[in-house]
């Protein structure tokens, strides 16, 4: 049985449309969580403008990065730290909530013996949040380390670990095991995994650029929530795509779990 991208896209889209209300609900809650955390830790408008003015003439070379950092005062370094903490923490917690609830929802719906309920889903997924926090932090760390060296290694890391969030919801699968199995599955299905991950990253980059401008210019929080929501909805579609591919791969080889 061959697995084509076209069939996967259609299958994922059908599931996505059928569950659109639940998807919007979880995506909205995740967006609100991310926005609240971002608001709590984000530097105020004056601090952001000060930082923006400092880097306005920065051309991006490594030497200039070192020079810029050395030129910063302790207060400006603290502002940069708060900005970084705000972005990373809001993304980490929001994604942990989103991934745990969406994958739990898919597991429940696929198991026709169980009835899906939003509030029961939140309760069931809450026990998975610590594992997702750890896994997402680890994936983000490895991906950013790869991108710090060169862009391609970071993308490769993300591609090969893309099944691990699905796998850790299975019984007796540790974070380490989920990573190992994810690499194995991805290696066997690289032609159907890589294109969708590349597309997802491109869309996320566009959203990131726009939302970063919103942060610098101090737009309303409701507008930022909207961009978080759009990002979450797109991410959910990718999760559904990857889950469907995982199921088909499991049927095809029947030896991943």
From Swiss-Prot:
Main location class: membrane
Keywords of the record: Cell membrane, Membrane, Transmembrane, Transmembrane helix
Transmembrane segments: 23-43, 89-109, 122-142, 148-168, 190-210, 223-243
Keyword Phosphoprotein: no
GO cellular component: plasma membrane
UniProt subcellular location: Cell membrane
Entry keyword annotation includes Transmembrane: yes
InterPro entries reported for this sequence: UPF0259
Pfam families: UPF0259 (PF06790)
Membrane topology, from the record: Multi-pass membrane protein
Family stated for the protein in its record: Belongs to the UPF0259 family.
NCBIfam families reported in the protein's UniProt record: PRK02868.1 (NF002774)
Protein name as it appears in the record: UPF0259 membrane protein WIGBR3650
Organism lineage string: Bacteria, Pseudomonadati, Pseudomonadota, Gammaproteobacteria, Enterobacterales
């Amino acid at each position: 049985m061959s697995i084509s991208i076209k069939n996967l896209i259609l299958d994922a889209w059908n599931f996505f449309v059928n569950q659109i209300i639940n998807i919007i609900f979880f995506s909205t809650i995740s967006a609100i969580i991310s926005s609240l955390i971002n608001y709590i830790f984000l530097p105020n408008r004056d601090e952001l403008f000060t930082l923006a003015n400092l880097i306005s003439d920065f051309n991006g070379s490594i030497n200039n990065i070192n020079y810029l950092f050395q030129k910063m005062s302790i207060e400006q370094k603290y502002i940069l730290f708060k900005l970084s903490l705000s972005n990373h923490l809001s993304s980490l917690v929001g994604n942990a909530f989103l991934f745990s609830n969406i994958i739990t929802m898919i597991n429940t719906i696929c198991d026709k013996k169980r009835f899906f309920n939003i509030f029961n889903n939140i309760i069931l997924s809450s026990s998975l949040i610590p594992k997702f926090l750890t896994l997402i932090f680890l994936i983000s760390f490895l991906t950013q380390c790869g991108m710090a060296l060169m862009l391609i290694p970071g993308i490769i890391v993300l591609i090969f670990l893309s099944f691990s969030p699905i796998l850790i919801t299975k019984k007796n699968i540790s974070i380490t095991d989920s990573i190992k199995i994810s690499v194995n599955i991805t290696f066997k299905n690289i032609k159907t995994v890589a294109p969708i991950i590349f597309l997802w990253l491109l869309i996320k980059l566009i959203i990131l650029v726009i939302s970063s401008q919103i942060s610098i210019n101090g737009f309303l929080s409701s507008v930022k929530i909207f961009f978080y929501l759009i990002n979450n909805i797109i991410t959910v579609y990718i999760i559904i795509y990857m889950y469907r591919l995982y199921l088909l791969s499991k049927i095809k080889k029947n030896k991943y779990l």
